[in-house]
Each structure stands twice: as C-alpha cells, then as structure tokens.
C-alpha cells in the first residue's frame, strides 16, 4: 500500500508575464492530488532579494490577488506550494512543508524615461525666475510624481520642491550667487515606492541639467 501526495502542480498569472506597478495580479494554481480540496500557499521573491516572503498561507483557496502597488519594479519570482488535503508535506525546509512547489518569473514595470528642461535655457541673470519643466514617459499609471533638486556652487543637493504631481518648478534666482548650478528631478510612478533609494529618498528615474547664473 503506497501513500502518495500531489503529483503535479501549475501556476498562472493574469495579466501574464509582466504588468505595470499598481496592478493587482491574479495568481491561479491547480494540481493533481489523491484527495479533494488540496491546500495552496503563495510566495513572492522580490528583485535582488534572497529570502522568500509568504503572501498567502495554506488554505483551499487556489487563487491569490497580488497587489503590486508600492512594489519594487523589476524581476520577481512568484511561487505556490501545494499539499494534498491528507498530507503533512512530502518535503520540509526551514520555511515549511509541501508536496510540490512551482514558481514563475514575473516582471513589474514603471516609468521608462524622464526629460528635464529650463526656460530660459542654459543660462540666466541673477534675479530671473527660471521655469523648470520635467516629463516622464512609459509610466504604467497616470499622474507620476516629481521632486525637484538644486545643486548650488560649492554646496550639496537641496530639495526645492517635494514630490507632487506638478511637473513644473519656478526657481527664483533672486539673491542667488552667480556660478554653475545643477537642476535635477526625481520621478516616481503614482503607484511606485521607488525603484532606487538612498538616505535622501527614493525614485524610479532621475535627470539633471547644468545651469549657469550670471
């Protein structure tokens, strides 16, 4: 007499393969098991991560709605563990037990390009108000967010307009020192927590241009 666990498992995602940040991806698992009502547990592995995260614990529910809002863009791995209803798990690892496991690659995308311009272009006299305009293309969702920065001569970067949906910044140069500046923008998709980060914040894309005050 042989006791067997599940013999096959499958995992599919909708939308398939890739989606923009902010979309809820529906994962659907199926399996061939000796008994009715097998159990499914869903897992995710973030881009660059080494540890899997349980997204939905074992239950008889074979679907999981994975919200990508705030998730890091890039290559993910999505997985399901399957156990027969009468099985404690044919395999055991530090994270738990399963009869079978299946994983699929999945790509989450965000904004693909950023532009930045100034008017007057390139140079202006001290006292001029410079209009800085940014643009973002390829963003999965409407209303990306923009954060503007200035690098003054001999100084560090300073946020001059915090993240908002406004893609323009009016830079008053009254009282500013003449010299070479840099103007920059960080861009994030409306549903992105930022692909990259440092001590100053997070962003999906950035761009900068030199600017001279005379």
Q: What is the meaning of each model-derived region?
A:
Residues 77-83, 182-188:
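Extracellular recognition modules
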Residues 35-41, 141-147:
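Solvent-exposed loop segments of extracellular immunoglobulin-like
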Residues 68-75, 173-179:
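Surface-exposed, short loops/turns at beta-strand junctions within beta-sandwich domains
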Residues 83-94, 188-199:
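Short, solvent-exposed loop/turn segments at the edges of extracellular beta-sandwich modules
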Residues 54-60, 159-165:
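Short beta-strand segments within Ig-like beta-sandwich modules, predominantly Fibronectin type-III
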């Amino acid at each position: 007499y042989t006791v067997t666990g599940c013999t096959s498992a499958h995992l599919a995602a909708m939308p398939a393969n890739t989606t923009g940040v902010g979309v809820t991806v529906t994962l659907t698992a199926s399996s061939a098991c000796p008994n009715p009502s097998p159990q499914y547990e869903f897992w995710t592995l973030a881009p660059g991560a080494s540890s899997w995260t349980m997204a939905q614990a074992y239950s008889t529910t074979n679907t999981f709605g994975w919200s990508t809002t705030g998730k890091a863009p890039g290559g993910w791995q999505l997985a399901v563990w399957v156990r027969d209803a009468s099985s404690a798990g044919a395999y055991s690892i530090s994270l738990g037990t399963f009869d079978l496991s299946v994983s699929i690659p999945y790509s989450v995308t965000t904004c693909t390009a950023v532009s930045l311009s100034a008017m007057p272009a390139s140079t202006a006299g001290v006292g001029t108000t410079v209009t800085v305009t940014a643009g973002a293309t390829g963003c999965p969702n409407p209303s990306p967010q923009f954060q503007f920065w200035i690098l003054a001569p001999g100084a560090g970067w300073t946020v001059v307009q915090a993240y908002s949906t406004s893609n323009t910044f009016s830079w008053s140069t009254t009282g500013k020192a003449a010299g070479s500046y840099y103007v920059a923008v960080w861009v994030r998709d409306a549903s992105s927590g930022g692909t990259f980060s440092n001590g100053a914040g997070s962003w999906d894309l950035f761009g900068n241009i030199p600017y001279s005050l005379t």
